Amino acid sequence: MAVQKSKKSRSMRGMRRSHDALTTAALSVDATSGETHLRHNVTAEGFYRGKKVINK
């Protein structure tokens, strides 16, 4: 097993963990259908930027 050469301080532990935070998804509401969707993604009904791009 690997063994550290010296103890890491609380400060170094915190600096390492500073990048571990989770972010919420960026959601948008489509202008045409009023449906909530992820940014830069087609809605479930096939709309993108107010236009129908996928026919079901």
Swiss-Prot record:
A Gene Ontology BP annotation from the UniProt entry: translation
Alphabetical keyword list: Ribonucleoprotein, Ribosomal protein
Matches recorded under SUPFAM superfamilies: Zn-binding ribosomal proteins
Keyword Cell membrane in record: no
GO terms of molecular function: structural constituent of ribosome
GO cellular component: large ribosomal subunit
Chain intervals for the UniProt region annotation (Disordered): 1-21
Ranges of biased composition (kind: Basic residues): 1-16
Family (UniProt): Belongs to the bacterial ribosomal protein bL32 family.
Name recorded for this polypeptide: Large ribosomal subunit protein bL32
Native species: Vibrio atlanticus (strain LGP32) (Vibrio splendidus (strain Mel32))
Taxonomic lineage: Bacteria, Pseudomonadati, Pseudomonadota, Gammaproteobacteria, Vibrionales
Gene behind this protein: rpmF
